[in-house]
Amino acid sequence: MRARSLVGAAALAIGATAGAAAYVVARVQGRARGDVEDYLAGRVSADAPVLCLGASIVRGKASVDFVQMLRERVPHRTFVNAGVNGNVAWEVLQRLDDVIACAPGEVVVLVGTNDIQATMDPAAGESARRSKGLPETPSLRWYEECLAQVVRRLRDAGADVALCSLPPLGQDLDDAANARVREFNAAIARVAEAQGATYLPVYERLATLLASQGADAGPAWTGSWEPGVRSLAEHFLLGRSFDEVAARAGLVLSPDGVHLDTTGAAIVADLAAEFLSGDDPVGD
C-alpha cells in the first residue's frame, strides 16, 4: 500500500492529475506477464519451468522486462515471473512456498536493490521496517542471511540457482551508493560460493559497458523518488519507451538510475541464458 501511495503522491507532485496518477499506479502495480499466480492456476508446462525471482527489475513494469527477453531467447522453456515491486530479501524469503510450488528446475534471483536503498540512510531504513512490517531494519548482514536461506530452500527443493549481482545505482561508480552496491555484491558472491549457486556478474558487465562509453562518472544516485516517478509518468502517460526516457535524462542503461533500459535488461537476459545453457559466466 505504501508503494502505491508514494507513486501516486509523487506523480501528483510533478503535475499529473489525480486520474493520471491513479492510472500510473495501476500500470506499475499490474501483474507481471506469466506470473506465479498464472502458472499455479493451471497453465503448467510439462517440463520444469525457469523462475525469475526478485523485485521490480524482475517484475518488468518499471523496467524493461528481461524475463520476456528470456522467453524470446529460449523459446523451448517456460518462464515464470516472480518479481514483486519493492521487495527486500526477507520478503522474498516469505514468498518461497508459492515459488517452490511451481517446481522450478532453475531459479534466477535478482534482489537487493531495495535492501541497499534502505541501508543508505537511517531514516530510510526505519521507514522500510515500519511500512513493510519487517522484523528488523535492513542491513548488509541481514540481507546476506536472508539470501542464504532463500538459496538453501530452493536448492533443497531441487532447483539450480543463479544469483545476479546488483546493477549500479546511478552512473557514478565511485560514489558511496555504488561502494555499497559492491559490498552487497560481495555478499552475493559469498552466498553463491557457500550454497552451490552460480554467480551472474550483472554489475560487472554493466559497469564495463559504462566505462567503455566514458559514462561511469555520470549522474549520481541521490535517493530521490523523483527520477523514478518521472520515468513512470513519461512511460505510461506519454508513451515513451524506457530507452527514450533514459536518453532524455542523460542516462545510459537506466531510465531512472535504478531500473533497466533495453541494453541493461539484455545484459541480464544474456547472462541468464548463458546460465541455462550451461555456460559459466563467472570471471567477467
Language-model features: locations:
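Serine-esterase "nucleophile elbow" of acetyl-processing enzymes
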Residues: 19-108
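Alpha-helical cap/lid subdomain in secreted, periplasmic
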Residues: 44-46, 69-75, 91-284
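Short, intrinsically disordered low-complexity segments
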Residues: 1-3, 26-32, 152
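Hydrophobic alpha-helical topogenic segments used for membrane insertion/localization
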Residues: 2-25
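Short, low-complexity, intrinsically disordered N-terminal peptides in bacterial proteins
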Residues: 1-9, 39-40, 282-284
